[in-house]
Amino acid sequence: MIKFNEPSDGQIISFKDGVIQTPDKPIVPYIIGDGIGIDVTPVMKRVLNYAIGKAYGVSKEIKWMEIYAGQQAMDICGELLPQETLDAMKKYRVSIKGPLTTPIGKGFKSINVSIRQKLDLFACVRPIRYFPGTNSPMVESDLTDTVSYTHLTLPTNLSV
């Protein structure tokens, strides 16, 4: 059984009457991931910490809690996606993961697909908009403001 180090000064994100309640110090589980995840996940955490500090000063901060999936989980407990990881993702409601390797071979389901299915995550929502000062090959790129929705649980992904 895996035991994660829950930050003692963090709080759990909750819902009240269908509205998300984000505390000042939310606990956010993260999975480092495999391959490039080892390099990009720590940078992602630094960027988010900086952005929150810039927006809220010292009044708000993420309390990070490492959880395991992929090769790291295999090394620690002998399975690629431990139930404890899924339980933590459910309990804390918001989590972030780095890229996870999918071994090649028959009969193996992608860890990413397993996470989506077991947590009933059915949509990938991606806002797309222009940021002033960035270069773009599009004409009138400053008018770009849209959202892409991809359904993730159908046998074939459907994007709108």
Provide a role label for each language-model segment:
Residues M1-L143:
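Metallocofactor- and cofactor-centric catalytic cores in central/energy metabolism, strongly enriched
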Residues T150-T156:
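Conserved small/polar residues in nucleotide/adenosyl-binding loops
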